[in-house]
Amino acid sequence: MRKVKQNGSVTEQDYQPVLNVALKLLEIPEGYELNSVFGRKQNESDVWVFRYEKLNGENNGLNGEHYSFTVDNESHEILGVTWMDQRFASGQQLPSEKLTKELAQTFLNRTQPGLFDRLENHWIRPHDELITANGKKVIVTGMKYKCYLPEEDTWAWVIVGPEEKIITFEQRIKWEGGRLTEKWLHDIWLDMGNKIN
């Protein structure tokens, strides 16, 4: 196992309780291991950003393949998760709108009970992200179930990819003419100078 990158004076004791809660709700993909842990602010709250990368070192690093998630330090709620892997490259069969909704509901009921019933669905349609794998740009595509949460005036979404896998979930996203909430799970945003480390 490689050494986990951490920021500043962060120790495993600081983040392990939060990680333990998250690991009861999330399934780390086979072949991935914890690569880095950073404490950050998201919507002015303290969060942990966990990044898993491939154990074999293939396509690791910024803009590569990764499984990452953010967890609120106080409530231990999962605020977001993303799985960027070339296995979800565009051109594959995506779930129908009906199945996307069902899979989103199942995921949310497991990770954030009660949230699904409070959401107003605005649309369901394909969504693309860009990664680099084997030195080439790869478009990762899934069906995005985008919702609004009126009581918090925030947005949430679940993106379901090929093989009916959840490839992204985000909640408590503030939006006012554009996204205001930090994008700790988005390598393109990090690559623009919003560094994680």
Give the positions of each predicted feature.
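Long, terminal "pre-/pro-" and other extracytoplasmic accessory regions
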Residues: 1-197
